[in-house]
């Protein structure tokens, strides 16, 4: 009997240890929000971004070397290009990306899909810069009945905005076509689609290069015309382990914003150089000027807009319930950098961890 009790005790101990090890494995995984020890500067940082004017801060920072300068020689910068938010979300959740410039909609999705564990929103990047542009003969929403409208990708920021707007306009017979922005430009020129809800510079390209006109500027749908088109997110584990690396990237972000404010011509040139390198073609002066006129580069994440953005996913039919966003924001690194630069702190609107 004593041997049997001893065997049961050993089994219980083994199970307890196994459970503890299992818990440790989850805590150390890429999808955990559990605190991790500060390990100093990262050996490398994988930075995601899009070849769009709405990601101007990222493009400027890469072109001018701001991120690399702020990171220093001890951290390798690995820029990683994406064309739409859902693909970047997959990279973040899979642990193959550390920090990403991304649309507000996919950022919310990344937080929701990981049950609030894997990512934190650490800064704003761009407000504005998205429009529904259409054929010249379309003068009102009701003219879109039975038509095809394009956007970049199912579930991305513009896809949610378009589908929400269509639902509010009761345009249930409009077909939404998800396709690459360059394909959209070609399709519009051929008359295959009636319009598209696009980020800059693509809305400007359809206007300047293909004769489209603006039916809806998304600015008109938001208070003060401000809404978060592009934000910056980080893997929670990377933030905990390498806070100084995160701060360095955010300093590069501030540098990019400063250039845009003090020397807009050079900021535009920097963006155009990056677009040429990434896509093989640069923007005409008319398109570049129009695209820049519709955006605001800002580190303010406009956190107060996010509950509405979450609800918009339900209205758009891409989510059954609005994701809960408490704990999504961690502006500690940003506010440290802003304070050092003598700038006012950013507000998380109660969506940070308490």
Set out the residue ranges of the language-model regions.
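Sec-dependent bacterial lipoprotein signal peptides
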Residues: 1-22
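Secondary-structure end/capping motifs
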Residues: 241-321
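Conserved C-terminal helix/tail region of periplasmic/extracytoplasmic solute-binding proteins
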Residues: 311-354
């Amino acid at each position: 009997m004593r041997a049997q009790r001893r065997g049961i005790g050993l089994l219980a101990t083994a199970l307890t240890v196994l459970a503890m090890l299992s818990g440790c494995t989850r805590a150390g995984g890429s999808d955990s929000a559990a605190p991790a020890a500060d390990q100093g500067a990262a050996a490398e940082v994988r930075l995601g971004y899009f070849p769009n004017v709405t990601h101007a801060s990222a493009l400027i920072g890469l072109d001018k070397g701001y991120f690399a300068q702020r990171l220093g020689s001890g951290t390798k910068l690995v820029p990683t290009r994406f064309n739409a938010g859902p693909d970047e979300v997959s990279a973040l959740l899979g642990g193959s990306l550390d920090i990403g410039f991304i649309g507000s909609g996919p950022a919310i999705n990344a937080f929701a899909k990981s049950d609030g564990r894997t990512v934190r929103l650490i800064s704003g990047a761009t407000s504005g810069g998205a429009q529904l542009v259409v054929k010249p003969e379309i003068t009102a929403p009701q003219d879109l009945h039975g038509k095809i409208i394009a956007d970049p990708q199912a579930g991305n920021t513009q896809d949610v905005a378009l589908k929400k707007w269509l639902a509010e306009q009761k345009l249930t017979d409009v077909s939404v076509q998800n396709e690459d922005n360059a394909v959209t430009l070609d399709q519009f020129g051929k008359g295959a689609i009636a319009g598209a809800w696009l980020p800059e510079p693509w809305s400007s390209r359809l206007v300047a290069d293909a004769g489209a006109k603006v039916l809806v500027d998304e600015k008109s749908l938001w208070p003060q015309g401000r809404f978060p088109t592009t934000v910056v997110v980080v893997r929670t584990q990377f933030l905990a382990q390498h806070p100084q690396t995160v701060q360095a990237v955010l300093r590069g972000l501030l540098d990019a914003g400063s250039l845009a404010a003090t020397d807009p011509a050079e900021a535009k040139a920097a963006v155009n150089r990056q677009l040429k390198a990434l896509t093989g073609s640069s923007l005409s002066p008319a398109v570049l000027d129009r695209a820049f006129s519709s955006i605001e580069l800002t580190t303010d994440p406009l956190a107060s807009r996010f509950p509405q953005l979450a609800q918009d996913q339900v209205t758009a039919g891409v989510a059954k319930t609005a994701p809960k966003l408490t704990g999504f924001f961690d502006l500690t690194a940003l506010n440290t950098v802003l304070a050092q630069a003598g700038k006012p702190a950013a507000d998380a609107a109660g969506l940070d961890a308490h």
